[in-house]
């Protein structure tokens, strides 16, 4: 599955460079219009991030998120500041298809355990974001000593199967995805579904990932810079 990405900041679609809130570029002041273009191209999935929420630890762009849910038929996965069961409940209740728990998976693993038990593994995704294969937290503002392997192994043990893995050094850089890391994790943990995030520069990066065994791929900056088109993504969307 191909997931075009929309990152929300102050109600607008933006992109950040390596997760730096000071390095922001506006993609579209109207995220709903952008989502409808994705849907019109025949793509069926959307990766949505509330960047304000990631920093604040609570829903910030809820009105925009609700309008995207109500006015498109896209399968929406949503992340950004989801740190309580109440927030998980709130988003799933408005029709978000699955939610991504990031920082909280490291700091409050019991939240993930409870959420998976209550809603099922198809509704709960764990975000594994970091630098040098060490997990970063709090909207990528803090670094930890926990390795990618450790968090995936721990979360598999509580029933998680889907993991969005982001190498922050690649995010928003068009430098190519870290295929070695992603395929290594997928091979080491065959019961997991590793979702690639960060670094896609062209359509070959997408097909190379697919050939390596990674089938769920998030595409952000390359799409909005024009290096990858919606039509190209539709062609390779399995």
Curated annotation (Swiss-Prot):
Pfam families: His_biosynth. The lineage of its organism: Bacteria, Bacillati, Bacillota, Bacilli, Lactobacillales. It catalyses: 1-(5-phospho-beta-D-ribosyl)-5-[(5-phospho-beta-D-ribosylamino)methylideneamino]imidazole-4-carboxamide = 5-[(5-phospho-1-deoxy-D-ribulos-1-ylimino)methylamino]-1-(5-phospho-beta-D-ribosyl)imidazole-4-carboxamide. One of its GO terms (molecular function) is 1-(5-phosphoribosyl)-5-[(5-phosphoribosylamino)methylideneamino]imidazole-4-carboxamide isomerase activity. The active site is at residues 7, 129. Pathway: Amino-acid biosynthesis; L-histidine biosynthesis; L-histidine from 5-phospho-alpha-D-ribose 1-diphosphate: step 4/9. This is 1-(5-phosphoribosyl)-5-[(5-phosphoribosylamino)methylideneamino] imidazole-4-carboxamide isomerase. It is found in: Cytoplasm. PANTHER family: 1-(5-PHOSPHORIBOSYL)-5-[(5-PHOSPHORIBOSYLAMINO)METHYLIDENEAMINO] IMIDAZOLE-4-CARBOXAMIDE ISOMERASE. Keywords: Amino-acid biosynthesis, Cytoplasm, Histidine biosynthesis, Isomerase. It comes from Leuconostoc mesenteroides subsp. mesenteroides (strain ATCC 8293 / DSM 20343 / BCRC 11652 / CCM 1803 / JCM 6124 / NCDO 523 / NBRC 100496 / NCIMB 8023 / NCTC 12954 / NRRL B-1118 / 37Y). The gene is hisA.
């Amino acid at each position: 599955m191909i997931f075009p990405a929309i990152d929300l900041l102050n109600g607008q679609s933006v992109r950040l460079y390596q997760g730096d809130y000071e390095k922001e570029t506006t993609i579209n002041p109207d995220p709903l219009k952008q989502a409808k273009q994705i849907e019109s191209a025949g793509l069926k999935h959307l990766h949505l991030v509330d960047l304000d929420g990631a920093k604040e630890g609570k829903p910030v762009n809820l009105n925009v998120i609700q309008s995207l849910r109500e006015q498109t038929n896209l399968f929406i996965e949503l992340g950004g500041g989801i740190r309580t069961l109440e927030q998980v409940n709130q988003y799933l209740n408005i029709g978000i298809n699955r939610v991504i728990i990031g920082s909280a998976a490291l700091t409050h693993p019991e939240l993930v355990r409870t959420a998976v038990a209550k809603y099922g593994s198809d509704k709960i995704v764990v975000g594994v974001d970091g630098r040098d294969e060490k997990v970063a937290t709090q909207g990528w503002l803090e670094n930890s000593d926990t390795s990618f392997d450790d968090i995936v192994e721990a979360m598999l043990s509580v029933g998680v199967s889907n993991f969005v893995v982001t190498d922050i050094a690649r995010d928003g850089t068009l430098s190519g995805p870290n295929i070695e890391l992603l395929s290594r994790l997928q091979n080491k943990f065959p019961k997991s579904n590793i979702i690639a995030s960060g670094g896609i520069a062209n359509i070959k990066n997408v097909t190379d990932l697919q050939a390596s065994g990674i089938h769920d791929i998030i595409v952000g900056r390359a799409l909005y810079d024009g290096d990858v088109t919606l039509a190209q993504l539709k062609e390779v969307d399995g």
